[in-house]
């Protein structure tokens, strides 16, 4: 089986040495290397050109989203490119990944997306980095969605209409949902894919990342929640229940009788319940994260009610 033409689209802003490491890891693995820059001030665009990448400078007069950046990279792919590897600029691609994923895709013509194991480069640096590493350890086999790093079949992405550019987060699961509706498959392979440098060292960074997830849940449910997949409906409801409705109900009950404040013990009880399945650390932050997710979901509803759109929610 002959090797298919493959490109890579890398997106980033001010990633510095991480971007250089990312682009170098792709050299020799792809026939076309594209870097989409969203307003870097650290010389990222020039460094990418020096490494042989086609550089696209995103028009920042329009609202920025990662989805817009990925579509901009798609738009400059050369004719004949069969697969495209999407990568975030803070990731390093495993030297065997693209060949492994491309072989799988060629052997499975209904596969539109293949992703592998994304690992955190420095999980020992912070609890938040460890949480990211655990989050990316998803089951092997046919899947519902991928993350930001994945090899995709170009014709499938084009016919699906590309990424939904208005989404500030959750753009990959939304695209995967449309691909699956069109009869395509999403696969998680048992193979090393990328090393990611999350650099989440402070609670505030983790909180904003969780807020962004809650916003994505609510927006995804608003877009596709009525479908048979019930896209992110359960995730949104859990966030709003544990992060908003229950705290308000407990506070109001405590106004009637202070002893009813004991109902708040449901939270440590939930941590202990989840600890049996995921360990104490992950369970604790899973419960804490519901407050941040609820904040993000409520923020989405607030902006939708006002007829406005929220800008990107960054955590680095």
Language-model segments: which ranges?
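Glycine-rich, basic loop-to-helix element that forms the pyrophosphate-binding segment
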Residues: 60-79, 144
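A conserved acidic beta->alpha catalytic loop
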Residues: 25, 37-46, 91
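Short, well-formed alpha-helical segments that are part of the catalytic scaffolds
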Residues: 11-28
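Short beta-strand-to-loop acidic/aromatic patch adjacent to the donor-nucleotide binding site
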Residues: 80-92
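Conserved donor NDP-sugar-binding/catalytic core segment of glycosyltransferases
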Residues: 92-127
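Membrane-embedded multi-pass helical conduit in multi-pass membrane proteins
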Residues: 241-307
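A recurrent flexible, glycine/aromatic-enriched loop bordering the glycosyltransferase active site
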Residues: 119-121, 135-152, 159, 168, ...
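Catalytic donor/gating beta->alpha subdomain of glycosyltransferases that bind UDP-sugars
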Residues: 164-167, 173-229
